[in-house]
């Protein structure tokens, strides 16, 4: 195990330890209140989430000239998510997906069909996460009449958008086209193909947010649903940072910071994040089954 991976375990365990010292007793008391009926609902929503995510990967893969069956896309997506939940960095599962679909195992990180399919699929989800957060935060500012904050958010974003559009149309498009992966990238992230996988990413993102909100409801927490809709993407984004194990510790610390904006007690907000993490791991357990079945061949 590399030193950087050990550091990620230390970060996750260290942050959880710090939070448990300060809020441990209250967190345990809150989690004890969980309503199992909501857990069943979360598992059902998660199943739909995996099906949509796997189909998004299959759909994008078609435009990288990689043919993946729908059954295999579901199986490997479960495996990938399970591995991302327990291994450092949050990308080991994606590397596993690439490895098992790459033509030459020695060239796993070459920008080939398998590499492109996984990276572009992840990029589609991350773009939706970012877009959802920006739009929902803007709506939050308008509803709460925070017009100055709204202008500080959107005026720079508009300027950045047109600047990037200018760069893309004049230089970047030509550069991308000159690369062997360029046509695939432009096909996937422009036109009808882009909007189709973007719609899939929207519903996948909504499922993540619904699961987080239901995790809070399952603990009997009285929440402002719209505020949760706005700030949950921040917590989800924190989980994608490659500095921990499956987002553990970082997610809970982000929830602590968000608690001040949501008007929740710190222990309740952290409890919701922990419950979400536990449920996220439970929902990915079919990946362990598929992985063991794969290893037994």
Language-model features, listed with the residues they occupy:
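Interfacial segments of multi-pass membrane proteins
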Residues: 101-109, 253-268
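Predominantly cytoplasmic-facing regulatory/coupling regions of multi-pass membrane proteins
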Residues: 1-78, 138-240, 271-297
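Membrane-embedded alpha-helical segments of transport systems
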Residues: 79, 83-87, 112-134, 271-286
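Transmembrane helix boundary and interhelical junction motifs in multipass membrane proteins
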Residues: 51-56, 89-98, 240-255
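Membrane-interface alpha-helices at helix entry/exit sites of multi-pass transporters
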Residues: 71-75, 93-94, 107-120, 264-275
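Transmembrane alpha-helix termini and helix-breaking/packing motifs in multi-pass membrane transporters
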Residues: 131-142, 261
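Extended non-transmembrane interhelical loops and adjacent amphipathic helices
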Residues: 74-105
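Transmembrane helix-loop junction
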Residues: 62, 85, 103, 217, ...
């Amino acid at each position: 195990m590399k030193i950087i991976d050990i550091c990620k375990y230390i970060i996750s365990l260290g942050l959880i330890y710090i939070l448990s010292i300060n809020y441990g007793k209250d967190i345990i008391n809150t989690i004890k209140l969980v309503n199992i009926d909501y857990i069943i609902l979360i598992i059902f929503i998660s199943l739909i989430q995996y099906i949509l995510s796997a189909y998004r990967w299959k759909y994008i893969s078609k435009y990288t000239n990689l043919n993946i069956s729908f059954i295999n896309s579901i199986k490997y997506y479960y495996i990938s998510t399970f591995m991302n939940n327990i291994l450092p960095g949050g990308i080991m599962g994606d590397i596993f997906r690439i490895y098992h679909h790459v033509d030459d195992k020695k060239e796993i990180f070459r920008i080939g069909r398998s590499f492109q399919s996984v990276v572009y699929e992840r990029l589609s989800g991350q773009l939706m996460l970012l877009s959802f957060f920006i739009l929902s935060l803007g709506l939050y500012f308008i509803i709460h009449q925070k017009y100055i904050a709204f202008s500080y958010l959107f005026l720079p974003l508009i300027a950045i958008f047109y600047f990037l559009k200018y760069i893309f149309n004049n230089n970047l498009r030509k550069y991308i086209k000159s690369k062997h992966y360029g046509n695939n990238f432009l096909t996937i992230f422009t036109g009808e193909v882009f909007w189709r996988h973007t719609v899939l990413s929207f519903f996948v993102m909504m499922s993540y947010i619904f699961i987080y909100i239901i995790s809070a409801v399952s603990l009997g927490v009285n929440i402002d649903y719209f505020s949760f809709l706005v700030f949950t993407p921040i917590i989800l984004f924190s989980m994608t940072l490659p500095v921990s194990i499956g987002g553990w510790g970082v997610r809970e610390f982000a929830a602590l910071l968000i608690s001040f904006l949501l008007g929740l007690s710190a222990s309740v907000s952290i409890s919701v994040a922990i419950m979400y993490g536990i449920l996220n791991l439970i929902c990915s357990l079919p990946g362990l089954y598929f992985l063991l079945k794969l290893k037994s061949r």
